[in-house]
């Protein structure tokens, strides 16, 4: 029987600290959202902004800062898949590499699931729901300015759009925070300073990416701040509450084998989260429709989206409820 490592622990306090810091920073800096973004966009450092915004994985011709997080993700995927193969090929079992793969599998699954859930699903679903106009659209007089917590002028009935809130590039940079958590979970004793240094650098890298996006008039200050703190909090929750990585590691140390889980467990949870997103979108879009003239009938999407979301939330909950042997 394992006790929740978050009860009366630094991990819970850390989550509270992340959330409180994010709320405080947004509360203080929201009044300066428009003016600080305008200032940075008119005082841009072009070479810096262009490099930070580029990524060959997003069809850029030249590599850029956005490429830094993709090689570790690809490497994690290449290790994650064979980490399950020992179940089907006994010749792979027993060796040192097999032992390493199986013991490291929870961290590999955490890396892939967190990156998929936070940097992709959460960001793009929220973009479609909020519909906030980008700074360049506002500065050019094409669309009105709206606060980060308000419904923006974009709506799916107006055609395809990529909303400003939250920041996708900043969320991609925040994948570095995932790697820092992996380091902290892999190192012990005096070497943990490497993980803490990695965490500080990853937060700094995420913030710098956000500044570059503001310089290019692609995102508002609050887009960046919300993305940084929300992604960090979600990563923390997935690590300690959803996948319970410390408990999985402790189980392996005690028993010499991983907890019994379905094949590709973390990717299955990611797939369920993907299926959850349309329900969340439909529910929120139905609620937003009342503010767009002629589209109030879309309010009918709300109960449909709610039923869809509740169904897959239940599936996710059931998938997470299991008893280790």
What are these regions (language model features)?
Residues 148-298, 314:
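Membrane-embedded catalytic cores of phosphoryl/pyrophosphoryl-handling enzymes
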Residues 289-325:
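C-terminal regulatory/interaction regions
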Residues 88-128, 192-199:
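Interfacial segments of alpha-helical transmembrane regions
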Residues 118-144:
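Aromatic-rich transmembrane-lumenal/periplasmic boundary elements in polytopic membrane proteins
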Residues 11-16, 106-109, 193-199, 264-272, ...:
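Membrane-interfacial loop-to-transmembrane alpha-helix junctions, especially the N-terminal start
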Residues 2-3, 30, 78-97, 180-189, ...:
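Structural signal for the C-terminal ends of transmembrane alpha-helices
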Residues 15-29, 113, 117-118, 200-204, ...:
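Alpha-helical transmembrane segments
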Residues 1-90, 127-130, 143-145, 156-157, ...:
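N-terminal transmembrane-helix/juxtamembrane module of multi-pass inner/ER membrane proteins
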């Amino acid at each position: 029987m394992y006790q929740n490592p978050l009860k009366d622990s630094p991990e819970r306090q850390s989550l509270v600290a992340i959330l409180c810091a994010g709320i405080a920073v947004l509360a203080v800096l929201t009044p300066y959202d428009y003016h600080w973004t305008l200032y940075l966009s008119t005082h841009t450092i072009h070479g810096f902004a262009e490099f930070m915004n580029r990524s060959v994985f997003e069809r850029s011709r030249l590599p850029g800062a956005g490429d830094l997080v993709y090689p570790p993700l690809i490497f994690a995927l290449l290790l994650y898949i064979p980490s399950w193969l020992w179940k089907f090929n006994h010749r792979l079992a027993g060796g040192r590499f097999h032992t390493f793969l199986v013991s490291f599998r929870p961290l590999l699954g955490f890396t892939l699931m967190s990156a998929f859930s936070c940097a992709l699903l959460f960001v793009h679903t929220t973009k479609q729901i909020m519909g906030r106009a980008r700074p360049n659209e506002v500065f050019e007089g094409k669309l009105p300015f709206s606060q980060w917590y308000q419904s923006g002028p974009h709506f799916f009935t107006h055609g395809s759009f990529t909303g400003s809130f939250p920041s996708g590039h900043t969320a991609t940079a925040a994948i570095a925070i995932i790697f820092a958590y992996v380091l902290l979970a892999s190192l012990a004793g005096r070497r943990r300073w490497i993980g803490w240094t990695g965490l500080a650098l990853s937060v700094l890298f995420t913030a710098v990416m956000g500044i570059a996006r503001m310089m290019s008039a692609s995102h508002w200050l609050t887009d960046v701040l919300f993305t940084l703190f929300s992604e960090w909090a979600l990563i923390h929750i997935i690590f300690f509450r959803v996948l319970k990585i410390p408990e999985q590691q402790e189980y392996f140390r005690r028993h010499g084998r991983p907890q019994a889980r379905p094949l590709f467990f973390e990717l299955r949870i990611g797939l369920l989260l993907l299926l959850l997103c349309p329900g969340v979108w439909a529910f929120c879009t139905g609620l937003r429709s009342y503010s767009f003239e002629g589209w109030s009938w879309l309010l009918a999407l709300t109960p449909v989206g709610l039923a869809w979301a509740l169904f897959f939330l239940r599936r996710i909950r059931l998938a997470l409820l299991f008893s280790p042997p």
